[in-house]
Amino acid sequence: MRKLIFLFIIINSFVFTQWVQNERATKTTAGNLVMENVPSIPVEIKEKSRRYSNIRSASFRSWTQDGKEMLIATRFGETTQLHKINQPLGQRKQITFYDEPVGGGYFSKDKTKNGFLFSKDTGGNEYWQVYYYDFNQGKETLLTDGKTRNSIGGWSNNGKLFAFSSNKENGVDMNIFISDLKGNEKQLFSEKGSWSAIDWSVDDKRILVRRYISINESYMHFVNIEDGKMNQFNQSKDKISYGSGKFSKDGNGLYYTSDESTEFRHLRYYDFKSKNHSIITKDIKWDVRGFTISENGKYIAFVTNEDAISKLYVLKTKDYKSVKIPSLPIGQISGLKFNPDNNRLALTLNTPKSPGDIYVVNIKKRMLTQWTESEIGGLNNDQFVVPELVHVNSFDGLKVSGFLYRPKTKGPHPVIISIHG
């Protein structure tokens, strides 16, 4: 009997030990994340998900001075870096090699400069610095102090100076500075808030700057380079949300986007001489998300957000008549920029079957050319579902748009509802 009791104690002790070990095994820690009673992920599921995490994309950054090549951003390895490509679907040549992702990538128009501006931080600290990469020397130069937060504002039209925002004055407010590549910099003004440089005037004597308050409120000012004097653009008692702004190539006016007195953010033009504001896209009842102007000022291209689908328009600036362009796949368009030849328009296009690639629209030939074809982790994009645009009535009678992804296989299937406000 004692032997049985002793054996019972041993068995129960073993079971209790295993139970304790199992209980401990259900609690795991990964950094600040503590998981309890979460089952381990099967290896086969990890392998399937890994293919999706290895999907790459490419985004357009800028054309080279001669317009024969372009600078793009894509990820090889862990972070997004800058690459150069010289023909459609050509081999990408990596230029930057950093542990941190790289932003910017803007060439100067100064023919004596063979390089571009870019930005990056260190170790994810979000203290972005401005650098210049010189192709002749094959190396980069730090242009900011290495300690503060900075943002590139673009080159002057003559390509000798560049503007940038920095909080170097007090560590909080982002003010505007201009500098050359030798470090001769100048602070244009000292104001509270977050300011960014939007565009240089044709004669490089003024910079258009914007102070961002919120998604519904922002202000734009003209700043004189010589003395830093500021003049607010379009003073109003109403709260206005401004998007981008660009001086017309003839120097006679300003193209800009705003939602002033309208439900949508329209593309507008302000005439410096007559002081008149005109709405270019008054017949388009959607937000204008971005625009660009050809170097000769002949064309203006812009993108609207129409039920969450991007639509590209190209107009002649002399009469705002539409220019016929080739059809684009349905998706999200960004990064518009005309080639120096004034005929080709580069853009980044994200579609349901492609995570993001670069296309070029030839306006004269009405032809669309794909310049990059990003890897999709070995997946077959023929199996990707193209969603359909649907509209449903909300509780207040308004129509709400959405995208419905229908599985290609027979159901029943689980349903995922993702709300974007």
Residue ranges and their predicted role:
Residues 76-79, 121-126, 167-172, 213-216, ...:
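Short glycine/acidic-enriched loop and turn motifs that connect beta-strands
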Residues 60-69, 76, 105-115, 153-161, ...:
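Blade-terminus and WD-like Trp-Asp/Gly-His loop motifs, strongest in beta-propeller folds
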